Amino acid sequence: MKTTRIMGMLLLSAAFLFSSCAKKQDDGKVAFLDREVDVKSFLTGFPYSTWGFYLSDDATKLYYLRNDEPSPLVMLDLTKSTDISQGDVISSDDWSKKNFWSPSWNEKDGFLYWMGDQRNDEKIDLYRMDPKTGETTCFTDVPYIYGWSFNDAKDKAFYVARIDQVGDDHVDEFHILDLKTQEDKTVCTDRPDFRMTWTEIASSPDDSGCLLTVLKNVNRTFTNIAYLDYATGEYKVITDPSVEASLDGCAVISPWYSQDVAYFLSDHTGYANVYSFNRATGEVRPVTAYRQDLRAKWLEADGKKYLATVRTSPEGSDVAVLDPDGNEIVCERYPATLTLKTTVGNKMYFTAGATDILFQMWVVEFVDGQLKQSVLVDLPENIKSSMVTSHAQKLSIPTFDIDPATGETRMLHAYLMVPEKPLPADQARLMVMSFYGGDNAYDMEHQIFTAAGMYVLSASPRGSSGFGRDFAALNDHDLGGNETIDMIYCARYVSEMLGIPPERVGCFGMSHGGYETMRLMTFPGEVNGFKTSFPFGFGVAVAGFCDIIWEHYHSNIPDWDYLEAGDPVTEKDKLMDRSPISHVDKISGPLLLIHGDHDDRVDIGGSQMLYDALKKEGKPVEFLIMKGQGHGYKGIDNQMLYYRTILDFIARN
């Protein structure tokens, strides 16, 4: 599908769209209906990604990319400053042209390690760099690395790599890399019944084995924990493989508690909880039984080990300290979404965010059985106030079916972002996020839309995370089914609540959300025997796919398509009916397609096919290519083009 003809057409589309934006490219302001939106002030006011901050294990260094042109890699020494604008550039390469994932500073050898690629194409390898010289070493040459970690001494790295893939089948290998000699040893190749795909690794203190996650028959809904013996290369599954557990709800906790005892997380009871494993006896024991997903790391205070835990929900985050048996010593709720980054002694380090909090770093100290919270890293008040242009209104929206837990109509959580300065009533717009919504987190795209005076609906349809394993699994094998009905109900509810007619309601989303946008715009009116409709006025589909079966065979993560949609062979008819390419004649309004030409996760052909089909039908469609970009768009120039194109499209529709 990636032919010269197609790329030429896409580049022409991009050139046309870019030329229409060129006059105001420098000042960064975009004319939108009754106002100008200073998009560039958002991009320069906070030239980072809210999720792209990486804290070293010892909490002394913060690594992040800055969205300049070019986009450098920056390190902030937290022992000297807590102002992220004062970070030192440690690599002046243009990191907008490559991926930088899971970095970790090794204080033992002074190198920074990460997994990434060289051209945003997700050929993921393991790298390290000397921050003093910028010299970089690539240790591997494989199609994909799923996960990696250090040992306790930090003189070895463990990683699982995809070695070969033919169609849906692939082979993964577990490797041990000696960081001093650079000797790379293959420990084992995985088994067809339990693949090491998307693994996490926690090595034992004596480096004789590890806990890792494995997928039964490459099925993300049957994620298990296994113990791997390095000497024999054999691994034994220690959780019940007959019980469902999700990939997102299972994890290993590093370091181990002791020489023979390790802790891990599993949501096989419905929520991610803590369990312990004794490799000497083989015993697995439940430690916690919360009805809320949990994350945990070890904490030390007064010479004892404790579990530092955090549970998040739209209402906030519960931080609790537990003893090794799971007894809760103290718990505090904080009105933000907290991500536990590391622990040092009795201190927990979190990144914090909310719909109105861009980025903070917190320290929560466990002292005398109590928690003491303070903000370590924050932004200046003038930046914070200028970057928030709306307030969040929490909604509970009824959908079409009955929740078996309550016996009543299922209610969906959502946030409505209400602009400080809305458009006049006769110009009012509502933007509906098609998927991945409902988080209590800052979203720059939402704030740019509300700066333009538009309302933004961020809802959590079935399949969303944050509400337990079972809710997240409700859309498994039902892509484009009941999740789509949920979003139609949400859009109609808020459209009527605000008095904004459907022709001024648009949907937008990326990846799964890009597909869902295409699906909502071309919805045939019935799925799973249920009839409903909502005539969206326009849509913005980013990195989406229009043909589920084609996507399955052209993605570097085909197991995702299999889980979400179904078997492309035995369920072909269903998958084709759920594919927007099958219903182009029913599109309800103009559609803007945006895609990176280096995207290996969702191939650009998925947008090209829909563009061609809509053009053939005489339907209004536009196509922007993000040159040199993968599954996400980096760099200020790329982001200016992205937002300018979207705002111009919405204003014209």
Where are these regions (language model features)?
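C-terminal motif of bacterial Sec signal peptides marking the signal peptidase cleavage site
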Residues: 18-20
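Bacterial signal peptide processing site
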Residues: 22-24
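A short helix->beta-strand "capping" segment at the edge of beta-propeller domains
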Residues: 27-48, 87
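Conserved beta-propeller blade repeats
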Residues: 47-65, 94-112, 142-163, 189-216, ...
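Beta-propeller domains
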Residues: 64-93
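Short, solvent-exposed loop/turn segments at conserved positions within beta-propeller repeat blades
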Residues: 68-71, 119-124, 165-172, 217-223, ...
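Short loop/turn segments that connect beta-strands within beta-propeller blades
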Residues: 78-81, 130-134, 178-182, 229-233, ...
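Serine-hydrolase catalytic core recognition
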Residues: 337-653
